[in-house]
Regions:
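Alpha-helical transmembrane segments of multi-pass membrane transport proteins
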Residues: 1-321
């Protein structure tokens, strides 16, 4: 933890600490050098796993949709639909983050995108900085829970579990957490009206045709893509890799229909995807090495003993966690 607070890349921290304590364990006779060099076989297992191909495809899908300005259009659409609700822009950001979490599956991408496109308009509209930043920071982290979360893909490979089953199990808690965020924003806006801008009465009204047109352009494309990707995974119709391929192809199709599929945007999307994928995979490699040394040195047994002897019960463990 001390090294993590130095802002050094977490992947390097985990791998470095694992190697350091692995060498200490070898010198003290906890495990042999043969067991120590099992690092290489574990890393090769990651690289040789065909299911992991879904990770770069999901990353590219999210980056390509961001370059096609899908996120910007979706946020503007939600702001229009929620313009008469107290704290409507903050709620729009939360809904937008939920949808984009289901597109990218990465926290970092959602945080960066939402900060760039949502924070300036919220501050300009009169939202308190703590509410604006808190909304973005909290809702952007839904990408770690809502499928297709990249973490869940890796977790399914580490555990003997089906990816579709794990996605289905994580979907409802993620949506519930998003709903709780919306309830909190509504309650906070009612209790502290100074934290949100006052509702302005507008003389212009929108007809049903205009509202439908806005929804079709801003909401329908990303929701349809999410439904296609997630539906194919949860029903077991295709594998996770095939579903990710469909998502990447769908992102390219949406970009083409909006006139954003240019050579420059494609190059930028591939470059950003490669940078993010490298970071993600090295983080996973470091975490794999760290967990291996942690188990060999008896870390799992120590935690289980602490939990068993704590006497706080299952609800107490839940509160502590």
């Amino acid at each position: 933890m001390l090294v993590v607070f130095t802002s050094y890349p977490i992947g390097f921290v985990l791998a470095g600490v694992a190697i350091l304590f692995g060498l200490i364990g070898s010198l003290t006779g906890v495990f042999s050098l043969v067991e120590f060099f099992l690092f290489t076989s574990r890393i090769w297992f990651i690289a040789d796993n065909l299911q992991i191909i879904a990770v770069p495809l999901f990353v590219f899908m999210g980056v390509m949709l961001e370059r096609a300005e899908i996120a910007k259009d979706l946020l503007e659409t939600l702001q229009i639909l929620l313009r008469r609700v107290p704290g409507g822009m903050a709620m729009a950001v939360t809904v937008m983050s939920t949808v984009f979490a289901a597109i990218t599956g990465i926290i970092g991408a959602t945080v960066v995108i939402m900060t760039l496109i949502a924070l300036p308009p919220m501050l300009k509209a009169g939202y308190r900085p703590e509410l604006a930043l808190g909304t973005i920071a909290a809702s952007s982290t839904l990408g770690i829970l809502i499928p297709p979360s990249i973490l869940l893909v890796f977790l399914a490979e580490l555990l003997p579990m089906s990816i579709g089953t794990l996605f289905a199990a994580a979907l409802y808690p993620g949506l519930l957490l998003s709903a709780l965020y919306l309830i909190y924003i509504g309650g906070y806006s009612f209790a502290v009206p100074a934290a949100v801008p006052s509702l302005t009465r507008t003389t212009t009204t929108m007809g049903a045709t205009q509202i439908i047109a806005i929804i079709v352009r801003g909401v329908l494309p990303p929701v349809a893509l999410i439904g296609m990707v997630m539906g194919s995974i949860l029903t077991g119709f295709v594998t996770i890799t095939e579903s990710a391929s469909v998502g990447a192809a769908g992102a390219l199709l949406l970009a083409a229909t909006r006139g954003k599929l240019t050579w420059h945007n494609l190059q930028e999307s591939l470059h950003r995807s490669a940078m993010m994928i490298g970071m993600i995979f090295f983080l996973f490699v470091g975490a794999t090495c760290f967990s291996y040394v942690f188990r060999v040195l008896g870390g799992d047994d120590l935690i289980l003993a602490l939990v068993d002897n704590s006497g706080v019960g299952s609800w107490g463990i839940l509160l502590i966690a």
